[in-house]
Protein backbone atom coordinates (compact mmCIF):
# COMPACT_ATOMS: atom_id res chain seq x y z
CA UNK A 1 0.00 0.00 0.00
CA UNK A 2 1.43 3.40 -0.95
CA UNK A 3 0.51 6.84 -2.20
CA UNK A 4 1.70 5.84 -5.68
CA UNK A 5 -0.92 3.12 -6.14
CA UNK A 6 -3.00 2.52 -9.31
CA UNK A 7 -5.61 5.11 -10.28
CA UNK A 8 -9.19 3.95 -10.91
CA UNK A 9 -11.78 5.73 -13.07
CA UNK A 10 -14.61 7.60 -11.35
CA UNK A 11 -17.21 5.61 -13.34
CA UNK A 12 -16.20 2.34 -11.76
CA UNK A 13 -16.25 3.91 -8.31
CA UNK A 14 -19.76 5.28 -8.70
CA UNK A 15 -21.08 1.72 -8.58
CA UNK A 16 -19.69 1.13 -5.08
CA UNK A 17 -19.04 4.50 -3.38
CA UNK A 18 -18.77 2.86 0.06
CA UNK A 19 -15.50 1.20 -1.03
CA UNK A 20 -13.98 4.62 -1.68
CA UNK A 21 -15.20 6.37 1.45
CA UNK A 22 -13.14 6.41 4.64
CA UNK A 23 -13.91 7.72 8.10
CA UNK A 24 -11.34 10.45 8.73
CA UNK A 25 -11.43 9.61 12.45
CA UNK A 26 -10.45 6.01 11.68
CA UNK A 27 -8.01 6.80 8.88
CA UNK A 28 -6.01 9.28 10.94
CA UNK A 29 -3.58 7.50 13.25
CA UNK A 30 -1.62 9.60 15.73
CA UNK A 31 1.70 8.33 17.03
CA UNK A 32 3.83 9.81 19.79
CA UNK A 33 7.27 8.33 20.32
CA UNK A 34 8.20 7.32 23.85
CA UNK A 35 11.54 7.96 25.54
CA UNK A 36 12.55 4.34 24.88
CA UNK A 37 11.98 4.69 21.13
CA UNK A 38 8.60 2.97 20.93
CA UNK A 39 5.54 4.77 19.56
CA UNK A 40 2.13 4.96 21.22
CA UNK A 41 -0.83 5.04 18.85
CA UNK A 42 -4.33 6.50 19.19
CA UNK A 43 -7.10 8.02 17.08
CA UNK A 44 -8.52 11.56 17.30
CA UNK A 45 -11.90 12.30 18.86
CA UNK A 46 -12.80 14.75 16.09
CA UNK A 47 -11.65 15.56 12.57
CA UNK A 48 -14.53 17.72 11.32
CA UNK A 49 -12.56 21.01 11.67
CA UNK A 50 -10.17 19.61 9.05
CA UNK A 51 -12.22 17.23 6.87
CA UNK A 52 -15.75 18.61 7.26
CA UNK A 53 -18.84 17.80 9.31
CA UNK A 54 -19.28 14.32 7.81
CA UNK A 55 -15.76 13.36 8.93
CA UNK A 56 -15.33 11.35 5.75
CA UNK A 57 -12.74 11.30 2.96
CA UNK A 58 -13.83 10.14 -0.49
CA UNK A 59 -11.74 8.81 -3.34
CA UNK A 60 -9.26 6.46 -1.68
CA UNK A 61 -9.22 2.78 -0.78
CA UNK A 62 -7.54 1.50 2.40
CA UNK A 63 -6.63 5.05 3.37
CA UNK A 64 -4.27 5.47 6.34
CA UNK A 65 -2.92 8.83 7.49
CA UNK A 66 0.08 8.79 9.82
CA UNK A 67 0.59 11.87 12.01
CA UNK A 68 3.59 11.37 14.28
CA UNK A 69 5.25 13.47 16.97
CA UNK A 70 8.40 13.16 19.04
CA UNK A 71 7.65 12.98 22.78
CA UNK A 72 10.22 15.67 23.61
CA UNK A 73 10.37 18.19 20.76
CA UNK A 74 6.95 17.33 19.29
CA UNK A 75 8.56 17.50 15.85
CA UNK A 76 5.75 16.52 13.40
CA UNK A 77 5.85 13.90 10.65
CA UNK A 78 3.09 13.15 8.14
CA UNK A 79 2.54 10.35 5.67
CA UNK A 80 -0.49 9.25 3.63
CA UNK A 81 -0.94 5.73 2.25
CA UNK A 82 -3.69 4.01 0.23
CA UNK A 83 -4.08 1.02 -2.10
CA UNK A 84 -5.99 2.84 -4.85
CA UNK A 85 -7.15 6.33 -5.80
CA UNK A 86 -9.90 7.59 -8.10
CA UNK A 87 -8.97 9.50 -11.24
CA UNK A 88 -10.68 12.73 -10.26
CA UNK A 89 -8.96 16.13 -10.08
CA UNK A 90 -11.59 17.43 -7.64
CA UNK A 91 -10.71 14.91 -4.93
CA UNK A 92 -9.72 16.31 -1.57
CA UNK A 93 -6.03 15.71 -0.85
CA UNK A 94 -5.70 14.65 2.81
CA UNK A 95 -2.00 15.50 2.76
CA UNK A 96 -2.60 19.11 1.74
CA UNK A 97 -5.53 19.42 4.14
CA UNK A 98 -3.46 18.40 7.14
CA UNK A 99 -0.35 20.33 6.14
CA UNK A 100 -2.42 23.53 6.11
CA UNK A 101 -2.99 23.04 9.87
CA UNK A 102 0.57 21.98 10.71
CA UNK A 103 3.73 24.09 11.04
CA UNK A 104 6.10 24.51 8.09
CA UNK A 105 8.64 22.31 9.88
CA UNK A 106 6.43 19.24 9.32
CA UNK A 107 8.27 16.53 7.39
CA UNK A 108 6.29 14.54 4.83
CA UNK A 109 7.12 10.89 4.09
CA UNK A 110 10.89 11.05 4.72
CA UNK A 111 11.29 9.21 8.04
CA UNK A 112 15.09 9.36 7.98
CA UNK A 113 14.99 13.14 7.64
CA UNK A 114 12.46 13.31 10.49
CA UNK A 115 14.64 11.26 12.85
CA UNK A 116 17.73 13.31 11.92
CA UNK A 117 15.82 16.55 12.55
CA UNK A 118 14.67 15.32 15.97
CA UNK A 119 18.18 14.30 16.97
CA UNK A 120 19.53 17.67 15.89
CA UNK A 121 16.94 19.53 17.99
CA UNK A 122 17.69 17.34 21.01
CA UNK A 123 21.34 18.42 21.03
CA UNK A 124 21.55 20.70 24.06
CA UNK A 125 17.75 20.73 24.27
CA UNK A 126 16.12 23.12 26.74
CA UNK A 127 12.40 23.47 27.40
CA UNK A 128 11.36 26.75 25.69
CA UNK A 129 9.62 28.25 28.70
CA UNK A 130 9.80 29.39 32.30
CA UNK A 131 9.19 26.91 35.12
CA UNK A 132 5.92 27.61 36.96
CA UNK A 133 6.26 26.79 40.66
CA UNK A 134 8.51 23.86 41.54
CA UNK A 135 9.32 20.46 40.10
CA UNK A 136 7.00 17.91 41.75
CA UNK A 137 6.82 14.14 42.00
CA UNK A 138 3.95 11.85 41.05
CA UNK A 139 4.59 8.17 41.59
CA UNK A 140 8.18 7.45 40.62
CA UNK A 141 8.46 10.34 38.15
CA UNK A 142 9.19 14.06 38.28
CA UNK A 143 7.08 16.67 36.52
CA UNK A 144 7.19 20.38 35.81
CA UNK A 145 4.91 23.00 34.25
CA UNK A 146 6.42 25.59 31.94
CA UNK A 147 4.95 28.82 30.61
CA UNK A 148 5.91 29.23 26.96
CA UNK A 149 7.50 32.42 25.72
CA UNK A 150 5.80 33.02 22.37
CA UNK A 151 8.22 35.84 21.56
CA UNK A 152 10.92 33.17 21.54
CA UNK A 153 11.21 31.28 18.23
CA UNK A 154 11.42 27.88 19.95
CA UNK A 155 8.43 28.63 22.18
CA UNK A 156 6.31 29.76 19.23
CA UNK A 157 7.33 26.72 17.19
CA UNK A 158 6.33 24.34 20.00
CA UNK A 159 2.94 26.05 20.24
CA UNK A 160 2.42 25.59 16.49
CA UNK A 161 3.27 21.90 16.81
CA UNK A 162 0.91 21.32 19.72
CA UNK A 163 -2.11 23.31 18.55
CA UNK A 164 -3.47 20.75 16.07
CA UNK A 165 -4.39 18.61 19.11
CA UNK A 166 -6.99 21.27 19.96
CA UNK A 167 -8.86 20.48 16.74
CA UNK A 168 -8.50 16.73 17.20
CA UNK A 169 -9.48 16.42 20.87
CA UNK A 170 -11.56 19.45 21.87
CA UNK A 171 -15.09 19.75 20.52
CA UNK A 172 -15.53 23.11 18.79
CA UNK A 173 -11.87 23.88 19.51
CA UNK A 174 -10.03 26.43 17.41
CA UNK A 175 -6.57 27.96 17.20
CA UNK A 176 -5.76 30.90 19.44
CA UNK A 177 -4.23 34.13 18.17
CA UNK A 178 -0.65 33.68 19.31
CA UNK A 179 0.07 37.34 18.54
CA UNK A 180 -2.37 38.39 21.28
CA UNK A 181 -0.13 38.87 24.31
CA UNK A 182 -3.03 38.23 26.71
CA UNK A 183 -2.80 34.49 25.98
CA UNK A 184 -0.74 32.26 28.27
CA UNK A 185 0.31 28.73 27.27
CA UNK A 186 1.43 26.22 29.89
CA UNK A 187 3.02 22.89 28.98
CA UNK A 188 3.38 20.02 31.44
CA UNK A 189 6.47 17.83 31.07
CA UNK A 190 7.70 14.64 32.66
CA UNK A 191 11.24 15.65 33.59
CA UNK A 192 12.53 12.44 35.16
CA UNK A 193 15.08 12.42 32.34
CA UNK A 194 16.15 16.07 32.29
CA UNK A 195 17.95 15.74 28.94
CA UNK A 196 14.89 14.46 27.07
CA UNK A 197 11.69 15.48 28.91
CA UNK A 198 8.33 14.18 27.68
CA UNK A 199 5.30 16.37 26.98
CA UNK A 200 2.27 15.33 29.07
CA UNK A 201 -0.24 17.99 28.02
CA UNK A 202 -0.88 21.71 27.77
CA UNK A 203 -3.28 24.44 28.83
CA UNK A 204 -4.14 27.82 27.35
CA UNK A 205 -5.55 30.65 29.46
CA UNK A 206 -6.65 34.17 28.59
CA UNK A 207 -6.12 37.20 30.82
CA UNK A 208 -9.19 39.42 30.95
CA UNK A 209 -8.42 42.80 32.43
CA UNK A 210 -10.86 43.76 35.19
CA UNK A 211 -11.51 47.32 36.29
CA UNK A 212 -10.96 47.37 40.05
CA UNK A 213 -12.00 50.95 40.72
CA UNK A 214 -10.39 54.33 40.14
CA UNK A 215 -7.94 54.01 43.05
CA UNK A 216 -6.40 50.80 41.70
CA UNK A 217 -6.55 52.19 38.16
CA UNK A 218 -4.72 55.35 39.17
CA UNK A 219 -2.07 53.36 41.04
CA UNK A 220 -1.61 51.06 38.02
CA UNK A 221 -2.69 47.96 39.98
CA UNK A 222 -3.77 45.49 37.31
CA UNK A 223 -6.40 42.88 38.08
CA UNK A 224 -7.21 40.01 35.72
CA UNK A 225 -9.69 37.17 35.44
CA UNK A 226 -7.78 34.10 34.33
CA UNK A 227 -9.95 32.11 31.91
CA UNK A 228 -8.89 28.53 31.19
CA UNK A 229 -9.69 27.98 27.55
CA UNK A 230 -8.05 24.73 26.41
CA UNK A 231 -6.85 21.87 28.60
CA UNK A 232 -5.40 18.71 27.10
CA UNK A 233 -3.69 15.71 28.64
CA UNK A 234 -2.33 13.31 26.02
CA UNK A 235 -4.39 10.10 25.85
CA UNK A 236 -1.61 7.80 27.12
CA UNK A 237 -1.33 9.88 30.30
CA UNK A 238 -5.03 10.07 31.07
CA UNK A 239 -6.40 8.08 33.98
CA UNK A 240 -3.19 8.57 35.99
CA UNK A 241 -4.46 11.61 37.96
CA UNK A 242 -1.98 13.82 36.12
CA UNK A 243 -4.77 16.07 34.83
CA UNK A 244 -5.72 16.86 38.42
CA UNK A 245 -2.11 17.58 39.35
CA UNK A 246 -1.76 19.85 36.32
CA UNK A 247 -4.91 21.82 37.21
CA UNK A 248 -4.00 22.05 40.92
CA UNK A 249 -0.47 23.28 40.22
CA UNK A 250 -1.76 25.97 37.87
CA UNK A 251 -4.35 27.03 40.46
CA UNK A 252 -1.68 27.22 43.18
CA UNK A 253 0.40 29.42 40.89
CA UNK A 254 -2.53 31.75 40.21
CA UNK A 255 -3.47 31.85 43.90
CA UNK A 256 -0.03 33.29 44.60
CA UNK A 257 -0.36 35.94 41.88
CA UNK A 258 -1.97 39.08 43.39
CA UNK A 259 -3.04 40.28 39.94
CA UNK A 260 -5.33 37.25 39.45
CA UNK A 261 -8.63 37.88 41.24
CA UNK A 262 -10.69 35.06 39.72
CA UNK A 263 -10.16 31.81 37.81
CA UNK A 264 -12.89 30.79 35.37
CA UNK A 265 -13.30 28.14 32.69
CA UNK A 266 -14.58 28.59 29.15
CA UNK A 267 -17.27 26.10 28.15
CA UNK A 268 -15.87 22.98 29.88
CA UNK A 269 -16.70 19.44 28.82
CA UNK A 270 -18.34 17.12 31.35
CA UNK A 271 -15.04 15.34 32.01
CA UNK A 272 -13.20 18.60 32.68
CA UNK A 273 -16.10 19.84 34.84
CA UNK A 274 -15.72 16.70 36.95
CA UNK A 275 -11.97 17.18 37.26
CA UNK A 276 -12.40 20.82 38.22
CA UNK A 277 -15.16 20.09 40.76
CA UNK A 278 -13.15 17.38 42.50
CA UNK A 279 -9.99 19.48 42.56
CA UNK A 280 -11.78 22.59 43.85
CA UNK A 281 -13.69 20.62 46.48
CA UNK A 282 -10.58 18.86 47.74
CA UNK A 283 -8.55 22.07 47.86
CA UNK A 284 -11.34 23.98 49.62
CA UNK A 285 -11.94 21.29 52.25
CA UNK A 286 -8.30 20.38 52.83
CA UNK A 287 -6.81 23.83 53.05
CA UNK A 288 -9.52 26.31 53.97
CA UNK A 289 -12.66 25.07 55.72
CA UNK A 290 -13.93 22.10 57.68
CA UNK A 291 -16.75 20.32 55.89
CA UNK A 292 -18.92 20.13 59.01
CA UNK A 293 -18.62 23.90 59.56
CA UNK A 294 -20.58 24.80 56.41
CA UNK A 295 -24.10 25.74 57.48
CA UNK A 296 -27.07 27.12 55.55
CA UNK A 297 -27.25 30.41 57.51
CA UNK A 298 -23.61 31.12 56.57
CA UNK A 299 -23.91 30.60 52.83
CA UNK A 300 -25.49 33.94 51.93
CA UNK A 301 -23.39 36.03 54.33
CA UNK A 302 -20.22 38.09 54.12
CA UNK A 303 -18.31 34.97 55.25
CA UNK A 304 -19.17 33.19 52.00
CA UNK A 305 -18.40 36.23 49.84
CA UNK A 306 -15.02 36.69 51.49
CA UNK A 307 -14.20 32.98 51.18
CA UNK A 308 -15.12 32.95 47.49
CA UNK A 309 -12.96 35.98 46.77
CA UNK A 310 -10.02 34.58 48.74
CA UNK A 311 -10.24 31.32 46.77
CA UNK A 312 -10.59 33.24 43.47
CA UNK A 313 -13.69 31.23 42.52
CA UNK A 314 -16.44 32.48 40.23
CA UNK A 315 -19.91 32.77 41.79
CA UNK A 316 -21.53 29.85 39.96
CA UNK A 317 -18.68 27.46 40.72
CA UNK A 318 -18.58 28.51 44.38
CA UNK A 319 -22.35 27.96 44.71
CA UNK A 320 -22.00 24.48 43.22
CA UNK A 321 -19.18 23.61 45.61
CA UNK A 322 -21.19 24.69 48.65
CA UNK A 323 -24.19 22.70 47.45
CA UNK A 324 -22.00 19.63 46.99
CA UNK A 325 -20.64 20.08 50.51
CA UNK A 326 -24.22 20.19 51.86
CA UNK A 327 -25.05 16.95 50.01
CA UNK A 328 -21.81 15.43 51.32
CA UNK A 329 -22.76 16.38 54.88
CA UNK A 330 -26.09 14.58 54.51
CA UNK A 331 -24.43 11.50 53.01
CA UNK A 332 -21.95 11.25 55.91
CA UNK A 333 -24.19 12.41 58.78
CA UNK A 334 -22.08 15.51 59.45
CA UNK A 335 -24.92 18.00 59.92
CA UNK A 336 -28.18 18.70 61.70
CA UNK A 337 -29.58 20.23 58.52
CA UNK A 338 -32.39 18.15 57.05
CA UNK A 339 -32.55 16.84 53.52
CA UNK A 340 -35.66 18.95 52.95
CA UNK A 341 -33.83 22.14 53.95
CA UNK A 342 -31.01 21.38 51.53
CA UNK A 343 -33.47 20.50 48.76
CA UNK A 344 -35.41 23.76 49.20
CA UNK A 345 -32.17 25.75 49.34
CA UNK A 346 -30.93 24.32 46.03
CA UNK A 347 -34.36 24.61 44.40
CA UNK A 348 -34.41 28.30 45.29
CA UNK A 349 -31.19 28.85 43.32
CA UNK A 350 -32.52 26.83 40.41
CA UNK A 351 -35.72 28.88 40.40
CA UNK A 352 -33.86 32.20 40.48
CA UNK A 353 -31.60 31.04 37.66
CA UNK A 354 -34.58 30.08 35.46
CA UNK A 355 -37.16 32.54 36.85
CA UNK A 356 -38.24 34.04 33.53
CA UNK A 357 -39.07 30.65 32.00
CA UNK A 358 -40.59 29.11 35.14
CA UNK A 359 -42.86 32.07 35.84
CA UNK A 360 -44.56 31.44 32.52
CA UNK A 361 -45.70 27.98 33.65
CA UNK A 362 -48.64 27.00 35.82
CA UNK A 363 -47.76 26.06 39.40
CA UNK A 364 -47.99 22.23 39.10
CA UNK A 365 -45.78 22.25 35.99
CA UNK A 366 -43.34 24.69 37.59
CA UNK A 367 -43.00 22.53 40.72
CA UNK A 368 -42.54 19.41 38.60
CA UNK A 369 -39.81 21.07 36.52
CA UNK A 370 -37.99 22.20 39.66
CA UNK A 371 -38.18 18.74 41.22
CA UNK A 372 -36.89 17.11 38.05
CA UNK A 373 -34.00 19.60 37.85
CA UNK A 374 -33.16 19.09 41.51
CA UNK A 375 -33.22 15.28 41.26
CA UNK A 376 -30.90 15.38 38.26
CA UNK A 377 -28.52 17.80 40.00
CA UNK A 378 -28.49 15.80 43.23
CA UNK A 379 -27.66 12.63 41.31
CA UNK A 380 -24.83 14.40 39.50
CA UNK A 381 -23.44 15.82 42.75
CA UNK A 382 -23.41 12.35 44.32
CA UNK A 383 -21.59 10.99 41.28
CA UNK A 384 -18.91 13.68 41.56
CA UNK A 385 -18.59 13.16 45.33
CA UNK A 386 -18.23 9.40 44.96
CA UNK A 387 -14.81 8.32 46.21
CA UNK A 388 -13.98 11.65 47.89
CA UNK A 389 -13.27 11.72 51.64
CA UNK A 390 -13.44 15.45 52.22
CA UNK A 391 -13.88 15.35 55.99
CA UNK A 392 -10.87 13.03 56.34
CA UNK A 393 -8.54 15.38 54.48
CA UNK A 394 -8.06 12.82 51.71
CA UNK A 395 -5.39 13.08 49.07
CA UNK A 396 -6.15 14.32 45.57
CA UNK A 397 -8.88 12.23 43.87
CA UNK A 398 -8.84 13.48 40.31
CA UNK A 399 -8.31 12.07 36.87
CA UNK A 400 -6.67 13.24 33.68
CA UNK A 401 -8.91 14.81 31.06
CA UNK A 402 -9.36 17.06 28.07
CA UNK A 403 -11.53 20.13 28.03
CA UNK A 404 -13.75 21.27 25.23
CA UNK A 405 -13.74 24.83 24.14
CA UNK A 406 -15.61 27.27 21.98
CA UNK A 407 -13.93 29.84 19.75
CA UNK A 408 -10.58 30.46 21.24
CA UNK A 409 -9.39 27.24 23.86
Swiss-Prot record:
The active site is at residue 266. The record marks 183 as: Interaction with histone H4 N-terminus. Acetyl-CoA binds at residues 231-233, 238-244. GO terms for biological process: double-strand break repair; subtelomeric heterochromatin formation. It catalyses: L-lysyl-[protein] + acetyl-CoA = N(6)-acetyl-L-lysyl-[protein] + CoA + H(+). GO terms for cellular component: chromosome, telomeric region; cytoplasm; histone acetyltransferase complex; nucleus. It is found in: Cytoplasm; Nucleus. Its main location: cytoplasm. Catalytic component of the histone acetylase B (HAT-B) complex. Acetylates 'Lys-12' of histone H4 which is required for telomeric silencing. Has intrinsic substrate specificity that modifies lysine in recognition sequence GXGKXG. Involved in DNA double-strand break repair. Belongs to the HAT1 family. This is Histone acetyltransferase type B catalytic subunit. It comes from Debaryomyces hansenii (strain ATCC 36239 / CBS 767 / BCRC 21394 / JCM 1990 / NBRC 0083 / IGC 2968) (Yeast). The gene is HAT1.
Amino acid sequence: MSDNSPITSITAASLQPELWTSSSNDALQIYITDSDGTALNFHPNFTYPIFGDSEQIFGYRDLVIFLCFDHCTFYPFLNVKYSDKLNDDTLEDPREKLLSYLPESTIFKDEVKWVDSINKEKEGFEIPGELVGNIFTHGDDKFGIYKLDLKNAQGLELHKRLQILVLLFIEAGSYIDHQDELWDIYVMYKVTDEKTPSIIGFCTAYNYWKYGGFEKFDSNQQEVRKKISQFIVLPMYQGLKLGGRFYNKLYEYWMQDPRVIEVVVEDPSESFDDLRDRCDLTRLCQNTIKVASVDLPLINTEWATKLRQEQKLEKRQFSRLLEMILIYQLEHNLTNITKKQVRLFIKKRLYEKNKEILDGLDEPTRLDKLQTAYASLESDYKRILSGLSLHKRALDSTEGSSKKSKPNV
